[in-house]
Amino acid sequence: TMLPYLKEIREAISCHMAALPLPFRTTEEHPTFFNLPDNNGCTCHAPHGRTFPTALDPLYCNRYEMRAFFEEVNKIGIKLLGVCCGATPMHQREVAEAVGLTVPASKYREKMENHFMYGTNERTAKHMQDYGDNA
């Protein structure tokens, strides 16, 4: 939800600018993570009545969302990048790789060609690939 604001600010200024978003799926209705609802069918609600601060887990952005965000931010010239509260090492790796860096954590990037069901590696059993198409 902050990308339109970052673009607007970037167009208005010429100095250095930072982007350090939270790694959670905020919305226009809930622009911060302090009052994000859990609409994922959770039947065991947090004792304090909201997801913040201890029940945000199902609201995380995934690696692909993070990469797309930081690729876009990098394109518009914002160079001081990072992730704020709740970031995982995977989120930080996506920031680095989105701007073309290879970091020590890059060696842990998924290798989908070796996935037991969705892989394209010659060792991937055909019956498992077929199962994945219908799973």
Where in the sequence are the language-model features?
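Domain-level signal for soluble alpha/beta catalytic cores
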Residues: 1-135
